[in-house]
Amino acid sequence: MEYRTIRDILTNAEKCFGNEDAIRYKIGKNEIAAKTYTQLKEDSERITALLKKLGEPKSHIALIGATSYLWIASYFGIVDGGNVAVPLDVSLPAEELCELIDRADVTILIVDEIRKDVIEAAKEKCPKLKYILSMQKEANEGNILSLTKSMMEQTIDEDTGVEKTEITPDQLCTIMFTSGTTGKSKGVMLTHRNLVENATCLDMKLPERNVILSVLPIHHAYCLSMDILKGISLGAIICINDSLMRVAKNIKLFKPNMILMVPLMIETFAKKLEDVKDLPEKVVKEAVFGSQFHTICSGGAYLNPEYIELFERFGIQILQGYGMTECSPVISTTVAWNVKKNSVGQLLPNCEAKTVDGELWVRGSSVMQGYYKMPEETKTALKDGWLCTGDLGYVDEERFIYLTGRKKNLIITKNGENVSPEELENKLSSSRLVQEVLVREAKGVIEAEIYPDEEYAKKQGLEREEEVRVELQKLIDEYNQGAPAYKKI
């Protein structure tokens, strides 16, 4: 099946799997609820109809929330109606989220009630914002609309215009923010073609009704493209993990066949396998993952090949990939029948690569349009259609990619998050007590080496080194309080 737009993916899936489960999620501790492909399509169409009443065509609409059925339905509702989705990290401080909302020219915000602080801050700090839709509210409260109530008031028929709205493959549909080496997040502009071809151009020979447990943050391109878009294109059952603290329990509850993970999670599960390694190999796999489990897809950061061999012993294949948000995001991946040691996989069919002065450049239909309202950064990243990845590496004659290092100054944590050292250094340097600061990664954690302004310290009555150290620790503690977990020092 050839898809031109994201709408085609859901439309075809609903035709093929209408009354079959599309999304499963927990209610209460151990009860599973489900929504079918028909329900998902109808709810997304209601959201499209609602957004059409509220905004202008091609409106920029932000999504802030953990993975949920309503988040997924909202995403399809936004892009299938010709609008632009702006998925944002639910864990960011309210001030930073408001800045991104404003920079992305967002006029409608769909938000989870767990971020009430963002709702209040956005009303004051985001002048372009016209409507706020709450995912949990059951009734409208002032200018905060209930998403559920408002969408259920919409009728779906031939006159709603949902299917009539013309969208083209090269139309902008999603802006995803990623950390940059300058310290300022960049809005990666992705089209329908970018995301659709990235998700569907490679036949990984996965069965149609795979059960996938979605554990990664949904605002990440990796989760959105591979869990959601690829999963739905294959008629998969997507099960929503409600907490990283409960992944092991949710594996037993949902009984998935496969999971997308980052290396940090794989390392955690490797320890669980080691804990029961004295049992027969088949029993080990069943104890940790269940007998039905067969595949882990790894991405976001480097994975030690030893883990691939360890999991293989217990009948679990790890398919390792390489990518970046600017490439929608997958550039290369291993597949069960085509693996080369020390490679991060073979280029996707829609992608080509070359090496320029040791740096890997890629080109293809998954490469972004550019960075939103950042022409200079776009010019630096894109050279005649080639994306400069910032990674050192090469491609062999069989199109396998090998990475040898990094060119750009960016920390990639084990959970796949990109952290700009300059961003953290700028925040700490705002204190008069800090003369110089160097942020770096060491043994999997972020650390800061701070040189105090001794003259200023003395003026503040901080005579002893220990007193200065205490004040600097207070500064770091204060920063950590407002920082998402992956940016903590």
Language-model region placement:
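Conserved ATP-binding/catalytic segment of the ANL
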Residues: 347, 354, 359-413, 418, ...
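Conserved AMP-binding/adenylation subdomain of ANL enzymes
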Residues: 196-211, 218-283
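Conserved AMP-binding A3 loop
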Residues: 34-38, 173-199
